[in-house]
């Protein structure tokens, strides 16, 4: 269900704005999107796992907040990230 350290490192390298950047909104949204995708696959076989579903909803909410912040502060970065991750917006 969780992402591997190698995959997380690859996501950070792909979306980082500078070397060693792990806290920017782009990196955080990319990691959350990966975790959301993994949990979505999990729910295809475990439909009654409501405990994990709550975690999924919290992750979606956190990602939405980060995207709203990014949209408000820098529309260009927001648009590029949405296109790169293939999110509907």
From Swiss-Prot:
Q: Which CDD domains match?
A: Ribosomal_S15p_S13e (cd00353)
What UniProt keywords are attached to this protein's entry?
Ribonucleoprotein, Ribosomal protein, RNA-binding, rRNA-binding
Q: Which GO terms describe its biological process?
A: translation
| Membrane is among the record's keywords | no
Keyword Lyase found: no
So which domain of life are we looking at?
A: Bacteria
GO MF annotation, one: structural constituent of ribosome
Stored Pfam families: Ribosomal_S15 (PF00312)
GO CC terms of this entry: cytosolic small ribosomal subunit
InterPro entries per record: Ribosomal_uS15, Ribosomal_uS15_bac-type, uS15_NS1_RNA-bd_sf
The region annotated as signal peptide is: none
Family membership, please give it. Belongs to the universal ribosomal protein uS15 family.
Give the protein's function. Answer: One of the primary rRNA binding proteins, it binds directly to 16S rRNA where it helps nucleate assembly of the platform of the 30S subunit by binding and bridging several RNA helices of the 16S rRNA.
Subunit composition? Part of the 30S ribosomal subunit. Forms a bridge to the 50S subunit in the 70S ribosome, contacting the 23S rRNA.
HAMAP family cross-referenced by the UniProt entry: Ribosomal_uS15_B
Q: What is this protein called?
A: Small ribosomal subunit protein uS15
Tell me the organism: Caulobacter sp. (strain K31)
